[in-house]
Amino acid sequence: MQPKSISLLQKIDSIIETIIVKFTNIFENLQDANKTTEILSMESLAMENNCIQIIRLCQDLISISRNLKEIWVLNSIKVTQEKFEWKQEEIDIMFTQFNLLTDKIAEFETDMNKE
């Protein structure tokens, strides 16, 4: 495996582990019901902080996923070095596929922003 792949997998594992730790912290704070107002306010602040960090970590995972998809798609469309004449029909098909792909990506991003 390439060093880039290993470091990417380590980063993903690290992000997932951190998300699990943050969720665990949130659930641990919810267990004891007999707490003073001061402790509840401190735990509420800590819980809000954990939630914000979880959201940011999930955004990092989404970014990694998107980058991998872009690399996969762009590497699958290789252009040869030869002088090759494209037929207009082939060009139209390629543009149609590319436009469809960008529309789906934009639709996906719009759906993600609504949530």
From Swiss-Prot:
It comes from the Eukaryota. It holds the Pfam family Med22. Component of the Mediator complex. Coiled coil: none annotated. GO terms for molecular function: transcription coregulator activity. GO terms for biological process: regulation of transcription by RNA polymerase II. Keywords: Activator, Nucleus, Transcription, Transcription regulation. This is Mediator of RNA polymerase II transcription subunit 22. Component of the Mediator complex, a coactivator involved in the regulated transcription of nearly all RNA polymerase II-dependent genes. Mediator functions as a bridge to convey information from gene-specific regulatory proteins to the basal RNA polymerase II transcription machinery. Mediator is recruited to promoters by direct interactions with regulatory proteins and serves as a scaffold for the assembly of a functional preinitiation complex with RNA polymerase II and the general transcription factors. The gene is SRB6. It is found in: Nucleus. Belongs to the Mediator complex subunit 22 family. GO terms for cellular component: mediator complex. Disulfide bonds: none annotated.
